[in-house]
């Protein structure tokens, strides 16, 4: 289920080659849901919506296809080495030697890894503010039928509601995902 990022959109005038290459590779498809009454345009959404196929994780997996991605290890230390970096787990075992390291993790976790190596941007990481977001998943055989596939109410506690079945390549059973508004 797409319980995080619901779709990608591209600003008007964006080069189409990236979108087209993802669609040609079968990792993305256009999605144009029927929006519910009173729905505003979702924040930062353009007119060209794209979803991952068969799930949203297909796009980052495609982007990382030529990278050495390793899972199920908790890296707790970065150590400068002769030719790059050593990545150590919580037992001190070197899990990877790398020329470069890209961190795509929450700021507090990044700060814990970067502070021992003298990273100069710790103040910037400390200034990051998070806002929790509640997500509700509803799946069942007898769910009511709605006249819309997605809605982004402009007021109230809900910021986004979508029928997962409206997305190409998804299970046809109605499965609803509701995300709270930022203010809720």
Feature annotation, model-predicted:
Residues 1-35:
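N-terminal FAD cofactor-binding segment of flavoenzymes
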Residues 8, 63, 102-104, 138, ...:
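Generic structural signal for small/hydrophobic residues in well-ordered secondary structure
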Residues 71-86:
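A conserved short coil-to-beta-strand element within the FAD-binding core of flavoproteins
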Residues 95-151:
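Central helical "cap/lid" subdomain
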Residues 10-11, 32-62:
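Short beta-strand to alpha-helix junction loop
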Residues 131, 137-184:
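Active-site substrate-recognition segment that forms the wall
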Residues 81, 91-97:
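Glycine-rich phosphate-binding loop signature in dinucleotide/nucleotide-binding domains
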Residues 63-70:
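A structural motif corresponding to the C-terminal end of an alpha-helix
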């Amino acid at each position: 289920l797409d319980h995080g990022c619901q779709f990608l959109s591209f600003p008007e005038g964006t080069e189409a080659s990236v979108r087209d290459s993802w669609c040609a590779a079968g990792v993305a498809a256009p999605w144009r849901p029927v929006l519910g009454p009173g729905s505003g345009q979702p924040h930062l959404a353009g007119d060209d919506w794209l979803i991952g196929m068969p799930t949203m994780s297909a796009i980052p997996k495609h982007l990382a296809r030529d990278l050495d991605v390793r899972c199920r290890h908790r890296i707790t230390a970065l150590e400068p080495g002769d030719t790059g970096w050593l990545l150590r787990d919580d037992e001190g075992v070197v899990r990877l030697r790398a020329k470069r390291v890209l961190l795509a993790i929450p700021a507090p976790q990044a700060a814990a890894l970067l502070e021992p190596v003298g990273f100069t941007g710790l103040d910037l990481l400390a200034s990051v503010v998070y806002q929790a977001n509640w997500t509700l998943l509803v799946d069942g055989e007898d769910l009511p039928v709605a006249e819309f596939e997605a809605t982004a109410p402009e007021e109230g506690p809900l910021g986004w509601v979508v029928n997962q079945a409206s997305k190409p390549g998804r299970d046809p059973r109605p499965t609803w995902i509701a995300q709270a508004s930022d203010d809720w």
